Amino acid sequence: MKKIYPTGLPFLFFFVSLSMTTAQAPSITAATPSSGTVEQWGKFEVQLDVNATWVNPYDYDEIRVAGTFTGPDGAVKSVDGFFMQDYTVSNQQTGALTNVGNGRFKVRFSPDKPGTWTYVLTITNAAGTGTFAPQTFEATAVSPDDNPGFVRTDQTNYLHFDDGRQYIPVGENIAWQATNPYVDYKNWLTKLSDNNGNFFRLWQCTWGLGLEWKNGSNGYLGFRKYKQNNAFYTDWLLDFCAEKGIYIMYCLQYHGQVSTNVNPNWSDSPFNTVNGGPCANTWEFFTNATAKNHTKNRYRYVLARWGYSRNIMAWELFNEVGWTDQFEQRKNDISAWHEEMAAYLKANDPNRHLVTTSYVNEYNDPNTWNLPDIDFTQTHFYVETPFLERTLAGGVRSYLNDYGKPTINGEFGLSGSGAGLGALDPDGIHIHNSMWGSLFGGGLGTGMSWWWDNYIEPKNLYYHFAPMSAVAGVVPFHAANMAPAPASVSGVPADLLMTPTQGWGALSDTSFIINSDGSVTSAGAGLGQFLYGSEWNTQHRRPPIFYVSYPVSGQFKVRTGSDTGQSPKIVIWVDGIKVLEQNAAVNQTFTVNISAGQHVIKVDNSGTDWVTISSYTFSGLGSGVDAYVLKSENQTRMAGWVLNNSYNHQSVQSGGVPAAASGGTLQVPGMSNGAYTIKYFDCLTGAFLNSAPVEVANGALSVNLPDLLWDLAFVVEDQSVDVAEIPEPLHFEVFPSPTVPGSAVILEVDTAEKTDLQVTLLDTSGRALHSQSAGSSNGGRQQISFQLPGDLPGGLYWLKMTDGKRTSGTKSIVINR
């Protein structure tokens, strides 16, 4: 589990009240729109002058401003207004704010159709209701490149915009700021956008852009008194996201607020009776009527102020709600709370934003995932493994099968702590592999790394998003209704390594059948990380049993992880015979020889308490290439990603760049017979590389793969169907290789027309190191000299070329010192 460290923020807040000698019905004396014209799906805002009394303008039970909007087709939509204190950013370098005025009511609305809209504004308090005369504004047709509308879901595994285009989220978590929201988010999101990222996950947390917390804590003022500087930063953030084309999964509650055990903040919660709240225990947050009404008031404010925004992809009700106190005992209450709150958002959000929630994966509840108002599911995985992409893809496929809804990996990491991650994987290889594996494993978008501020930013790993986004843009995920398909790669023999993923107390699978192609039945995410002993915590014991056939004699290995309880002891049984029993410590490997033939292998712990397991390895039963394949509903389209699985952060750190995986044949059953074209894409640049014809016979695709130093993406399309044209790739050759630092290499390129060429040197992970303009080409075949920097360490590098319209695939070059 990730660790969370609170930080303070300044706070500005104003109570506003107009004293009146006698109670009279409130009135709106003026309504000033920000503009008389707004784009379809844009932000229409009107500012109100009112004559009314109130104590707390954020309490909808006390005073309410509302707008009723009638569209050009006669359809009627209603929205709440909201009270706000306005600010300006008075210092662009620090993000400091200066308040403007004393606060006022506003109404925001997003028109879903072009044409003339009529709106009526009202204000209501205990003294009555005042109505302002009807007004109008014009909604204009959209500029499609910048404004595709809101994000929607349908009966496919993917999301799309109002205008019909697919939306594939590519991004990361950026849950809170490190210093100042304006400064940090402007920096982070600019870099994300510059690399074609289009998504991040935001938390409404007390040390971030929260609205409500205990009176006197970090500038908060208690229930229904929302922190206005944070709300203003959120206003700015949504405007900035609209400018950059970035969409947010907005998490409205995090687990620590309702926990005394995991990242606990209950002691400072306004819901706690100690602080004057209605709940004596954390779990009453989900059942107490007063508590739920406070939550709904906050939701109402959120919807009123930000529900207009098309750049909110989804409301996330809770982060990892399984970490709240007594989760297993309170599952039914928590699910009922989700049902009520999801329905509340759906009923009061005129723009029908998507709704989801999240769990740490083994602590989830199918009842909640199956709720009709939960639009998509998500997984969170933190596993110390060189093959994290397998875990993410397994989780995605499991959730697609179990719940029949789109799903996304909302968080991933190599461990629950970011400490040391920069040394463990300085180039973000696990981020690259995890994003590609999770998307082509069936996710509605890429997996989302958790470590934005202490890893992606300081290591400048944003470049991993660009090629991912480029390839996602040419794959018809949504239009073809793609879904995961079985696939295997033969001809590249390797060991089979299985990585446990299930955490403490999980109901892990116990029976695993290893098939002849190296695939594993019950693979998914069902193998437990904890191997429990015979004396303590025995209620969790679920020792795994493997049914396997070795074609030749080999080995079976068990490697322990980095944590252990008291005096564990590894026991390995083969065909009912105990062949190994040894005391276990962390990071040890236990090996037994296995003869050719069919066997039943059981692993147990006869010691006192638990030990974590890092991996189980079966020699010679795997493939050196992993394939993640998606297939269209009509079985005439396919897309996928193939990975040389030796190219992972552990192997590259310990042994350098691995040898290319050669001789692989991809096999995918269940395709319609016919003539197809396979198109390959470079995963370091996103560039189209080349295409080749391929014939499907007997309902199975079989393709000889190119040599894989790292990975390739591909699309397979029916030759009889018109598909989007992809520009011809930009090809070049490079020599000499190997060479030495400081020398010049020659790039030979053939261009059909006059063009300006740019050459870039990349390191092994795709990070740009040095760029050089090659000048203007007059067309035809020519040679370009590229000067290598003199301080390069020895090793493998990549070169890429662009002509302003096209980007080439990469070519490798070896530098010796």
Positions of the model-derived regions?
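C-terminal outer-membrane/trafficking sorting elements
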Residues: 7, 19-22, 726-735, 740-817
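Non-catalytic, glycine-rich low-complexity segments
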Residues: 24-73, 80, 85, 138-140, ...
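Ligand-binding face of N-terminal immunoglobulin V-set domains in extracellular IgSF glycoproteins
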Residues: 40, 44, 61, 65, ...
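Aromatic- and carboxylate-lined catalytic core of secreted/periplasmic carbohydrate-active enzymes
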Residues: 53-55, 415-417, 431-581, 593-692, ...
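Active-site mouth of glycoside hydrolases
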Residues: 64, 124-126, 142-376, 380-388
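Residue-level recognition of secondary-structure-to-loop junctions
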Residues: 67, 99, 107-113, 550, ...
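Conserved structural position at the C-terminal beta-strand
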Residues: 123, 603-605, 801-803
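Extracellular glycoside hydrolase catalytic/binding regions
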Residues: 297, 321-469, 659-661
